[in-house]
Amino acid sequence: MSSSRRSRSRRAGSSVPSSSSSSRTSISEDQIAELLSKLQALLPESQARNGAHRGSAARVLQETCSYIRSLHQEVDNLSETLAQLLASPDVTSDQAAVIRSLLM
Protein backbone atom coordinates (compact mmCIF):
# COMPACT_ATOMS: atom_id res chain seq x y z
CA MET A 1 0.00 0.00 0.00
CA SER A 2 1.42 3.40 -0.86
CA SER A 3 2.10 5.96 1.86
CA SER A 4 -0.36 8.40 0.29
CA ARG A 5 -3.12 5.80 0.48
CA ARG A 6 -2.24 5.11 4.12
CA SER A 7 -2.31 8.82 4.89
CA ARG A 8 -5.72 9.23 3.31
CA SER A 9 -6.97 6.23 5.25
CA ARG A 10 -5.73 7.71 8.54
CA ARG A 11 -7.20 11.12 7.79
CA ALA A 12 -10.55 9.53 7.10
CA GLY A 13 -10.38 7.88 10.53
CA SER A 14 -10.70 4.38 9.14
CA SER A 15 -8.37 1.45 9.24
CA VAL A 16 -6.99 -0.28 6.20
CA PRO A 17 -9.78 -2.36 4.65
CA SER A 18 -9.34 -6.06 4.16
CA SER A 19 -9.00 -6.97 0.52
CA SER A 20 -10.27 -10.53 0.98
CA SER A 21 -13.55 -9.83 2.71
CA SER A 22 -15.50 -6.75 3.67
CA SER A 23 -17.08 -8.66 6.57
CA ARG A 24 -13.70 -9.05 8.32
CA THR A 25 -12.78 -6.55 10.97
CA SER A 26 -10.17 -4.14 9.73
CA ILE A 27 -7.06 -3.61 11.78
CA SER A 28 -5.17 -0.36 12.11
CA GLU A 29 -1.46 0.07 11.52
CA ASP A 30 -1.02 0.83 15.22
CA GLN A 31 -2.70 -2.47 16.11
CA ILE A 32 -0.47 -4.31 13.64
CA ALA A 33 2.61 -2.65 15.14
CA GLU A 34 1.47 -3.62 18.64
CA LEU A 35 0.83 -7.23 17.60
CA LEU A 36 4.23 -7.43 15.89
CA SER A 37 5.88 -6.05 19.01
CA LYS A 38 4.15 -8.67 21.17
CA LEU A 39 5.06 -11.41 18.71
CA GLN A 40 8.68 -10.28 18.61
CA ALA A 41 8.83 -10.34 22.41
CA LEU A 42 7.92 -14.05 22.33
CA LEU A 43 10.89 -14.94 20.14
CA PRO A 44 13.97 -16.12 22.03
CA GLU A 45 16.32 -14.14 19.77
CA SER A 46 14.33 -11.01 20.62
CA GLN A 47 15.05 -11.37 24.33
CA ALA A 48 18.71 -10.54 23.74
CA ARG A 49 17.96 -7.42 21.75
CA ASN A 50 14.93 -6.35 23.80
CA GLY A 51 14.63 -2.60 23.48
CA ALA A 52 17.04 -2.50 20.57
CA HIS A 53 15.86 -1.64 17.09
CA ARG A 54 12.54 -3.07 16.08
CA GLY A 55 12.64 -5.47 13.20
CA SER A 56 10.57 -5.04 10.10
CA ALA A 57 7.24 -6.83 9.96
CA ALA A 58 8.62 -9.24 7.38
CA ARG A 59 11.64 -9.99 9.57
CA VAL A 60 9.49 -10.62 12.65
CA LEU A 61 7.21 -12.95 10.68
CA GLN A 62 10.18 -14.82 9.19
CA GLU A 63 11.73 -15.27 12.64
CA THR A 64 8.37 -16.40 14.03
CA CYS A 65 7.92 -19.01 11.30
CA SER A 66 11.47 -20.25 11.81
CA TYR A 67 10.94 -20.49 15.56
CA ILE A 68 7.67 -22.39 15.13
CA ARG A 69 9.40 -24.83 12.75
CA SER A 70 12.17 -25.37 15.31
CA LEU A 71 9.57 -26.00 18.03
CA HIS A 72 7.84 -28.57 15.81
CA GLN A 73 11.19 -30.28 15.22
CA GLU A 74 11.89 -30.29 18.95
CA VAL A 75 8.49 -31.85 19.66
CA ASP A 76 9.15 -34.52 17.03
CA ASN A 77 12.56 -35.29 18.51
CA LEU A 78 11.21 -35.47 22.06
CA SER A 79 8.32 -37.67 20.93
CA GLU A 80 10.74 -40.05 19.28
CA THR A 81 12.96 -40.12 22.38
CA LEU A 82 9.95 -40.77 24.59
CA ALA A 83 8.71 -43.57 22.34
CA GLN A 84 12.15 -45.19 22.48
CA LEU A 85 12.23 -44.81 26.25
CA LEU A 86 8.81 -46.39 26.68
CA ALA A 87 9.81 -49.26 24.38
CA SER A 88 13.03 -49.85 26.29
CA PRO A 89 13.24 -53.06 28.30
CA ASP A 90 14.93 -51.04 31.07
CA VAL A 91 11.70 -49.16 31.84
CA THR A 92 9.45 -50.95 34.31
CA SER A 93 5.71 -50.99 33.83
CA ASP A 94 5.37 -48.70 36.86
CA GLN A 95 7.77 -46.17 35.34
CA ALA A 96 5.96 -46.36 32.01
CA ALA A 97 2.64 -45.80 33.77
CA VAL A 98 4.02 -42.70 35.50
CA ILE A 99 5.33 -41.33 32.19
CA ARG A 100 2.00 -41.98 30.48
CA SER A 101 0.09 -40.31 33.32
CA LEU A 102 2.28 -37.21 32.98
CA LEU A 103 1.41 -37.00 29.30
CA MET A 104 -2.32 -37.02 29.85
UniProtKB/Swiss-Prot annotation:
Pfam families: bHLH_ILI. Keywords: Growth regulation, Transcription, Transcription regulation. Gene3D superfamilies: Helix-loop-helix DNA-binding domain. Induction: By epibrassinolide. Residues 1-11 have a biased composition (Basic residues). Expressed in leaf blades, leaf sheaths, lamina joint, stems and panicles. Expressed at low levels in roots. GO terms for molecular function: protein dimerization activity. Residues 12-27 have a biased composition (Low complexity). Residues 1-27 are annotated as: Disordered. One of its GO terms (biological process) is unidimensional cell growth. Residues 16-71 form the bHLH domain. Atypical and probable non DNA-binding bHLH transcription factor that acts as a positive regulator of cell elongation and plant development. Binds the transcription repressor IBH1 and forms a heterodimer of antagonistic bHLH transcription factors that function downstream of BZR1 to mediate brassinosteroid regulation of cell elongation and lamina inclination. Gain-of-function mutants ili1-D (T-DNA tagging) show increased lamina joint inclination and hypersensitivity to brassinosteroid. Interacts with IBH1. Belongs to the bHLH protein family. This is Transcription factor ILI1.
